[in-house]
Amino acid sequence: MDNYSSLRIGGKQFSSRLMVGTGKYKSTQDMVESLSNSDTEIITVAVRRIKNDQTGDNLLEKINWKKYWMLPNTAGCVNADEAVRIAMLGRELAKLSGQEENNFVKLEVIPDKKYLLPDPIETVKAAEVLIKKGFAVLPYINADPILAKRLEELGCSTVMPLGSPIGSGQGLLNLSNIAIIIENAKVPVIIDAGIGVPSEASQAMELGADGVLINSAIAQAKNPPLMAQAINYGVKAGRQAFLAGRIKKQDFAIASSPEKNISI
């Protein structure tokens, strides 16, 4: 990506590089205000949450789907077959929201209940099937450069390496691998999971990531709408810093004031 304002995924263009999740908020009002403050255009929706919702507080009815692009996710799936089934349901949910041509899916296959780390083998299997079914697949993966390239070659629309475990707020723990993924990728790289504060979102963008996806850092903040706004600023600042280009690191000091031709 060569400018801030253009993020292209699956043939669709977005002006924001911040994706936001819809889970874990204390109230629907917090969620709606946070989405607005974030300036996001893509929001993730857990298909299982919608499918099993018995409260009457239907997420599909709370969000303006003319403003936001739905990214259904397969959270809760433990194998490829299950993920494919949930992805199909997600596509139907998108149609119900009025997005008839929405084939996006955030692919999550997570059998590990303690650390919530994605299964690379089942993720590849599910991605192969979903791509053949016409989905724009956005796979959630460990920060593994080889796996990221393999999924890109399969036809995934992005790769989404984790910064650190979901909801941990530990930030970017594997900078070297994330940097390699960014360097090698020919599809957008979206950093997903573990970001806790705006400075970490900015750091991801400064590395050259094309975007970030954030949920817990916003939803579980003391003031979610304010945190959403702060992270929005962090993402924009990080992207601009990447485009501007940082100075080279040196092992010694270099004076910023001229030392010659100064009359005293």
Curated annotation (Swiss-Prot):
It is an enzyme of class 2 (transferase). Keywords: Cytoplasm, Schiff base, Thiamine biosynthesis, Transferase. It is found in: Cytoplasm. 1-deoxy-D-xylulose 5-phosphate binds at residues 167, 193-194, 215-216. It catalyses: [ThiS sulfur-carrier protein]-C-terminal-Gly-aminoethanethioate + 2-iminoacetate + 1-deoxy-D-xylulose 5-phosphate = [ThiS sulfur-carrier protein]-C-terminal Gly-Gly + 2-[(2R,5Z)-2-carboxy-4-methylthiazol-5(2H)-ylidene]ethyl phosphate + 2 H2O + H(+). The active site is at residue 106. Pfam families: ThiG. One of its GO terms (cellular component) is cytoplasm. Signal peptide: none annotated. The keyword Transferase applies. Pathway: Cofactor biosynthesis; thiamine diphosphate biosynthesis. GO terms for molecular function: thiazole synthase activity. Its EC number is 2.8.1.10. Transmembrane segments: none annotated. GO terms for biological process: thiamine diphosphate biosynthetic process. Belongs to the ThiG family. HAMAP family: ThiG. Homotetramer. Forms heterodimers with either ThiH or ThiS. PANTHER family: THIAZOLE SYNTHASE. Catalyzes the rearrangement of 1-deoxy-D-xylulose 5-phosphate (DXP) to produce the thiazole phosphate moiety of thiamine. Sulfur is provided by the thiocarboxylate moiety of the carrier protein ThiS. In vitro, sulfur can be provided by H(2)S. This is Thiazole synthase. It comes from Prochlorococcus marinus (strain MIT 9312).
